[in-house]
A protein has these predicted regions:
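Conserved short alpha-helical segments that host acidic/polar catalytic motifs at enzyme active sites
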Residues: 1-246, 250, 262-269, 273-292, ...
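Glycine-rich oxoanion-binding loops at beta->alpha junctions
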Residues: 66, 70-83, 271-286, 309-345, ...
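Structural motif
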Residues: 67, 95, 293-295, 341, ...
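Acidic/histidine-rich
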Residues: 153-187, 460-487, 522, 529
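Glycine-rich, anion-gripping cofactor-binding loops and their flanking helix/strand elements
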Residues: 180-202, 206, 327-361, 500-534, ...
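Active-site phosphate/pyrophosphate-binding segments
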Residues: 260-264, 268-295, 385-514, 586-603
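Glycine-rich phosphate-binding loops that contact phosphosugars or nucleotide phosphates
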Residues: 289-423, 427-437, 471, 518-560, ...
């Protein structure tokens, strides 16, 4: 959600911060700001509502410095206004603070310590910076004032603090919100996402909860809140700087849709040997074989990927598998089996709801596996085991390639687990061949983009409502296709189990109501067709997407060959492209839909 950048050292701070903020745009934001200091008595604070370009246009050549902090804000406390934008400044204009997270006791702190202080914003962050300043006025150093403030606040935070009286130092603190230190040559950077600072360095230190960091141009000192020094390892982030660029594509989403065939091939290459045998860490395989039940915990698109993965684990590995929404599981944990293993799916690896569950079940002693696209993420670091999606940066808010990568990796893990346990179903399932079919089939569908654009225009050009139906994994992909359409086109789209239409939803069918029917499950294809005919009889405009061996001449889209259990790897390409073109035709920003953030780092 909110994004933080900071720099101190021999760099042009204004340009470093602006470029970093631009690379954080994909996370979602409604305002932005920066503070820069030249360490020679000149500093500047600029904040604006709107896009980064609005902030950039507000700067002139006088806004320069060798250290500073920047922020993109996603409103959680207070409306999107200039006053509520970060950085926040203390009334004595000594301290400047940026913050990602939520301080849950801000009101209590204000009442207890700041009754005589006039606040100019509605944010929890201003309470923190004013509290630091109030403590400093008692004679405490900036660092000690920050330490004492951290001992008082409750909630989640990633802080970057500048003391105007000591601009050669930058203070950083973290609790339950991601924050990285980037190591440079006579400079250091701070960021909530390595992607924002990859043009500066590829060496990053992932901070842990309770870390307090003092940065200068040449030093990084990490302590716990009680002053105990700690050492955190530095990791090299292997990523081509150009991977985060759109290249020839008008939008990141279209680029990422087109990258999915390559992602399928990359996953096979990463997790299999020359003989086509799946290679997973031995410790992970031992853990998985202890499971009497798997619990997949996820949110949003990742939850939908889990719904596709669950039957793969049950059919190939013979392990009962449940899929849970993280936001529900965190507060309403079901009765667990005797030997559960938890699998967490998250594109960003920073989803707050999922981390809450991870911390909870680890405290209960249960083994955990994170599957994510970001190797430096909190979920990757804190789980017992970690597998990377290797999908490359996903910048568009609407997830595409991470979804299909999650399904593909679930298939690889399910096959490996089933094979290790001698399951005949696993032996009969050639997952490498199926993922090769997925890659070629995805490419075929991508090349039919014009057909899908025309279909999207016919179905969704003026509609306010749309329905996607299917059974089994087709129901799972219906949920995801509906989510894609509603996310970026603002159409009230819903995915339903086709058999449930008659239990209420069919009452919503009117003349020309668009209904997309997925028909890839041989066990239920006839029933889904019957449901499609039923809504057509009531005036619905039906678009049928059918498996190659189940297709009829009047089906509008026939899929390339693939095992039915992996059909979502193909059907969702149609759903993604139709959503993309609907948003495009309606004139919306495909990559940055309203009210949505790419990385949901607060509950």
């Amino acid at each position: 959600m909110c994004g933080i950048v900071g720099v101190i050292g021999n760099q042009d701070a204004t340009q470093v911060l602006l470029r970093g903020l631009e690379r954080l745009e994909y996370r979602g934001y409604d305002s932005a700001g920066l503070y820069v200091n030249d360490q020679q008595g000149h500093d500047h604070l600029i904040k604006r509502v709107g896009r980064i370009r609005v902030l950039s246009e507000a700067l002139d050549e006088t806004v320069s410095g060798t250290m500073g902090i920047g922020h993109t804000r996603w409103a959680t406390n207070g409306r999107p206004t200039t006053a509520n934008a970060h950085p926040h400044v203390s009334n004595d204009e000594r301290f400047f603070l940026v913050h990602n997270g939520v301080i849950t006791n801000a009101a209590a702190l204000r009442d207890a310590y700041l009754q005589d202080v006039d606040l100019v914003s509605d944010t929890d962050t201003e309470v923190v910076v004013q509290l630091i300043a109030a403590l400093a006025r008692t004679g405490l150093t900036a660092k000690v004032a920050l330490q004492q403030t951290l001992g008082l606040v409750e909630g989640s935070y990633a802080f970057a603090l500048v003391d105007r009286l000591d601009p050669a130092t930058l203070y950083v603190a973290k609790n339950q919100s991601p924050l990285l230190i980037g190591l440079g040559d006579h400079f250091n950077v701070v960021t909530s996402d390595a992607l924002a600072m990859l043009d500066q360095t590829d060496r990053f230190v992932a901070l842990q909860d309770g870390d307090l960091v003092t940065l200068t141009a040449d030093t990084v000192t990490i302590e716990q809140l009680d002053g105990t020094p700690v050492v955190r390892p530095a990791h090299t982030v292997v990523l081509n700087d150009g991977d985060a660029e759109k290249g020839p594509y008008p939008y990141y989403m279209l680029k990422e849709i087109n990258e999915q065939p390559a992602v399928m091939r990359r996953l096979v290459a990463r997790y299999t040997d020359a003989a086509g045998q799946i290679q997973l860490p031995a410790a992970l395989m031992r853990t998985l074989q202890t499971a009497d039940r798997l619990y997949i915990v996820a949110a949003g698109t990742s939850y939908h990927a889990g719904l596709v993965g669950a039957p793969l684990f049950e059919q190939l590995a013979g392990v009962p598998t449940e899929v849970h929404l993280a936001s529900e599981f965190g507060y309403h944990q079901p009765l667990l089996s005797a030997h559960p293993v938890f699998i967490f799916l998250s594109q960003s690896g920073e989803t707050a709801d999922i981390r809450q569950v991870l911390v909870k079940v680890k405290a209960q002693g249960h083994p955990t596996l994170t599957i994510t696209n970001v190797e430096t993420s909190t979920l990757a670091r804190e789980a017992d085991h970690f597998l990377t999606l290797a999908a490359g940066p996903e910048i568009a808010v609407a997830s595409t390639k991470a979804y299909t990568a999650q399904i593909a990796l679930e298939a690889l893990v399910a096959k490996a687990l089933g094979a290790a346990q001698g399951r005949a179903a696993a032996a009969d399932f050639d997952v490498v061949h199926q993922l090769s079919l997925a890659a070629s089939g995805q490419q075929t569908l991508i090349e039919e983009a014009d057909v899908l654009h025309a279909a999207a225009r016919d179905l969704f050009a003026t509609t306010r409502n749309a329905f996607f139906i299917g059974r089994g994994v087709d129901h799972a992909v219906s949920l995801e296709a509906a989510l894609k359409l509603k996310e970026i086109s603002y159409v009230q789209a819903e995915g339903f189990a086709a058999g449930e239409l008659k239990h209420g939803t069919i009452a919503l069918i009117e003349q020309e109501t668009p209904v997309v029917a997925f028909i890839t499950d041989p066990l239920t294809a006839a029933h889904t067709r019957s449901n499609a005919e039923e809504v057509a009889a009531r005036g619905a405009k039906v678009f049928r997407i059918a498996a190659h061996d189940l297709a009829r001449p009047d089906d509008q889209l026939q899929l390339p060959p693939i095992d039915a259990r992996l059909s979502p790897l193909l059907t969702i390409i149609a759903g993604q492209l139709m959503a993309y073109y609907t948003s495009l035709d309606r004139g919306y920003d495909v990559d940055r839909p309203r009210n949505l953030a790419k990385s949901v780092t607060v509950e």
